[in-house]
Amino acid sequence: MNNLKRFTESIFSCIALSTLLFLGGCQTLPPADDLTPITVSHPDQAKAWELQGKLAIKTPEDKLSANLYWRHSEERDELTLTTMLGTTVLTLEATPNSAHLHIDGKDFKDNNAQDLLERVSGWSIPLADLPLWITGQIGSQDRVLSRDSKANPKQLINDQTPPSWVVEFLSWQLQSGAHIPHQLKLERGDLQLKLQINQWQALGKATIMIGEKP
């Protein structure tokens, strides 16, 4: 039994497959730190952000859908997957030099978040590139294959590590003052990921005026 199948069955022990396939609703966000919501004109102005949405993973043998919460900054990433009933099935906390994964009631650690997630869950998810793609930005290893009528990337390919990732930007939206993707589809071989971003909030450092109490 492969890792994805074993992990999928673990999730299904919390909730039936039929209810996992179509997910909605909200989740409680973690407490705020020293970052505060800001408005930006372009996503590259946001050095940190948080999002809520949905993630679907599909292979020839298995498929999984979950609610996604992701809080990203240059120093730290916090990623959580939950069922539609709010049950947490995976949490990943990562810094540039360390990663901690809690999954199926167990804890795992590694120096690299992407390697750790693939080793434990079997998911080959491009965590290093996703922050750019989620915000509609192009990395140095990406080749844009087509653009839409507004010059937004429509399809790109990243072949830094074969097999290549092919990314399709299916729709766009305005969030926090910036245009970002609403739906994306990523394919690499027989692995398919679908992302839907329902809420995206740009974050910045809170500032305290002179004479103002913190």
UniProtKB/Swiss-Prot annotation:
Ranges that cross the membrane: none
SUPFAM superfamilies for this protein: Prokaryotic lipoproteins and lipoprotein localization factors
Lipidation (S-diacylglycerol cysteine): 26
Membrane topology: Lipid-anchor
Family annotation (InterPro entries): LolA/LolB/LppX (IPR029046), OM_lipoprot_LolB (IPR004565)
Residue numbers with lipid attached (N-palmitoyl cysteine): 26
Gene Ontology cellular component terms for the protein in this record: cell outer membrane
Location within or outside the cell: Cell outer membrane
Signal peptide region: 1-25
Keywords: Cell outer membrane, Chaperone, Lipoprotein, Membrane, Palmitate, Protein transport, Signal, Transport
Major subcellular location class: membrane
Family according to the record: Belongs to the LolB family.
Assembly with partners or alone: Monomer.
HAMAP family the record matches: LolB (MF_00233)
Role description: Plays a critical role in the incorporation of lipoproteins in the outer membrane after they are released by the LolA protein.
Protein name as catalogued: Outer-membrane lipoprotein LolB
